[in-house]
Amino acid sequence: VIVGTPPISPNWPAIKDLLHLKFKTEITSSPLFCGYYLSPAGCIRNPLAHFAKLMTCVDDMSLPEKVLSYLSEVSIGHNLGDQIIQHLPPHLIQYQSACFDFFCRNCTPSQKLLLSNDPIPESKLLALVHKIKWASKAFFSELPQKAREFLVSKSSLPSFPNNPKVSELESELLHFSQ
């Protein structure tokens, strides 16, 4: 999905006949891709679909298992702030509000941190780091220096992927996630 009309590369005439692609062009004010509305400001989870998922998990009582996943999905768009109203079709604003209200009523204070644009306090991150055994590169890069140093000091594995133990753990994670 490309939001907006991209400029045509000066190389296009030379390579277009080498490609066997057919581009699907759709002009819309609210492009939807894989359940997310896309905009120049960012993406927003389709609030109607999200609301339906929330109500289904309330009905089948699976909310505790799914709440963090669903909260993460909605927090992406929520963190756009007031811009969200400009980039959603008007009939979906009420569902976005309903999802936000649902999370405000049903999430713990620590879960609600996902809905905040403020940085997570360093004290909370440091407390969290003492409990985890593994951190993704993206998460690690967002941590304050003290937390990164602590994780490195408690790690018994070298920080390079050629280590057989690291490869073994990664393969176990892959099987676990499938």
From Swiss-Prot:
SUPFAM superfamilies associated with the record: DNA/RNA polymerases
Q: What family does this chain come from, according to its entry?
A: Belongs to the tymovirus NS35 RNA replicase polyprotein family.
Protein name per the record: RNA replicase polyprotein
List the source organism: Physalis mottle virus (PhMV)
Lineage of the organism: Viruses, Riboviria, Orthornavirae, Kitrinoviricota, Alsuviricetes
Record field: catalytic activity? RNA(n) + a ribonucleoside 5'-triphosphate = RNA(n+1) + diphosphate
Checking InterPro entries in the record gives: DNA/RNA_pol_sf
GO MF terms listed in the record are: ATP binding; RNA-directed RNA polymerase activity
Keywords attached to this entry: ATP-binding, Nucleotide-binding, Nucleotidyltransferase, RNA-directed RNA polymerase, Transferase
Supply the EC number(s): 2.7.7.48
Name the top EC class. transferase
UniProt key word Acetylation: no
